[in-house]
Amino acid sequence: MRVAIYGITGGEAGKKECVRIVDAMRSAAAKVCKLQLRAFGRNALDFAPFLVEELRCASVDVQVKGILSAEEVMQELCGADVMLFVRGGISSRRGSAIAGIACGLPVVAYFGRETGQPITDAGVMLVSEKEEQELRDALVRVLTDEDFRAQLAKRSRLAQERYFGWPAIAENFVQALSSRS
């Protein structure tokens, strides 16, 4: 099973994110064989030594890459089973989270003040940032429950079609421009 992390915040916030990633991955590794972590994007390489070292004893296969082309991002995301998003509350303004949804991934993420539709229509399992155990439990559930993971993936694919795909975006522009006339 493969978990994707697309982008890590820099500085102290990034350190906190990596501690949360490691904590959730260790919990999942106790229940899932051959667990893989693929981290890539902004600041990922800065935290590679920490992620590799902290997950070594948990037998997690860790690979970290830097900034990738759009095609490479799509390949990484489409090769994953779930996206873990711990960069604060998920919202439609979070491009990396939208990329995971657009690739049909289940997403485990924190909810926040800006979390709402269309994110809540996608295959996102929302947890409280204040409750660390919720993140662990959510990741384990998505990785171990094949039917649940498939349901979340289906919801992400539908959200991509309804809200985030170019035809849906174009339709929204047409409606907005028509209402101005």
Residue ranges and their predicted role:
Residues 166-181:
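C-terminal alpha-helical cap of glycosyltransferases
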Residues 2-51:
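Conserved catalytic-core segment of nucleotide-activated headgroup transferases in glycan assembly
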Residues 141, 148-162, 175:
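A short, well-ordered alpha-helix in the C-terminal region of glycosyltransferases
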Residues 121-133, 141-146:
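Conserved acidic donor-binding segment of nucleotide-sugar-dependent glycosyltransferases
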